[in-house]
């Protein structure tokens, strides 16, 4: 509360300062009044002895405006007078307006309201030399000071009145704007209606026909139906003027029923089948197609023939190693066994096979010996390199290189070991064949 009271006091003092500044500016402007008017005012004061401060202020203001209009040289002074009425904020007021921005709009109309009362004070001060001895002047001063005190004390009431005046003015402006907008809309609506009426056709459009129009429509349709030579098309009577849904359904049914009747009464005269027939109709077997002589069965039989031709063309090729006949005679089996045994017993074929097999066996034995020696050598190299790496006499880079070399040698050793195993398998197969034929029937088996 203390802060609010301090702010109010500062605001009141600032308002008083602003009012004094405005009074000084009004005094300066009143000094520009013509001397004739001053003399008239002085005569009235001398005769009556009472100064009407409000009337003097009004006459001074009106005379100032007339003088500005008549004298072009005084236009600059009048403009100063007009600009002087605008509230110019000082440094203190600017600082206070930052604290209370909501009170700025309230104080401005209050200052404008107080200008009228204080013009009387300013005018009375300017004419003190003329009315110094009059008692009415003292009364005017007392009344002005009382008004000033009332204005400073009852600031909240004046603020409330100013707020009410602002709200009323805003309401009046809003109502004026609203009425202007409504008038503009009404004008636009009338213009649009006039344009639409200008674009309308001169003849009236009747959605429903009655009486004579219905009879005319039926006569036209009868003439049209009688002019048609096709017997399937029949005259249709259209009733105009009913509900929209009923007319829509009747037109849809009228479009569908003639199509269905034509499809039933007029079969396919060309004898061919349409794409819809091929989808809906069922194919009849070939036996029934012989009995029935219809075009549809003929078409189905042709379709079956085309399918058979397609199947014949896309048939798989036969297997050349297919078994044609299987005989269950025991003599044929015995003969086949004897022939297979006699191949090796024949004197012509045995030397050739033995020579080729002996050459292959020698090559396989030589290759097997070479691979076994190679594997032994690689294993020795790998062991030597691993021993060198285990001693730790090499640097880090050399150790990494040695490790990569050992890995590659191990891969090469595995490859050669696999090849050695395969060669040994082939060699053992050839030796088993020789044992089966009886060429090498004796084996010396010993233990080391």
From Swiss-Prot:
A GO CC annotation given for this chain: Gin4 complex
Region: Disordered, residue numbers: 63-103, 171-211, 242-352
Chief location bin: cytoplasm
Residue numbers of Phosphotyrosine PTMs: 344
Comp. bias regions, Polar residues: 264-281
Domain of life: Eukaryota
Record keywords, A-Z: Cell cycle, Cytoplasm, Phosphoprotein
Any one GO BP annotation for this protein: protein localization to cell division site
Localization terms from the record: Cytoplasm; Bud neck
Compositional bias ranges of the Acidic residues kind: 171-180
UniProt KW DNA damage keyword: no
Induction info: Expression peaks during S phase of the cell cycle.
Entry's Gene Ontology molecular function annotations: myosin II tail binding; protein-macromolecule adaptor activity
Modification Phosphothreonine, positions: 257, 274
Extent of Basic and acidic residues compositional bias: 181-191, 245-262
Keyword Cell cycle: yes
Biased composition annotated in UniProt, kind: Low complexity: 325-343
Phosphoserine: residues carrying this PTM: 70, 179, 194, 270, 273, 332, 340, 346, 350
Function: Required for normal septin function and cytokinesis. Its recruitment to the bud neck by CDCd11 and SHS1 ensures efficient localization at the bud neck of MYO1, the type II myosin of the actomyosin contractile ring.
Assembly with partners or alone: Component of the GIN4 complex composed of at least BNI5, CDC3, CDC10, CDC11, CDC12, GIN4, NAP1 and SHS1. Interacts directly with CDC11, CDC12 and SHS1.
Protein name: Bud neck protein 5
Organism encoding this protein: Saccharomyces cerevisiae (strain ATCC 204508 / S288c)
Gene from which the chain derives: BNI5
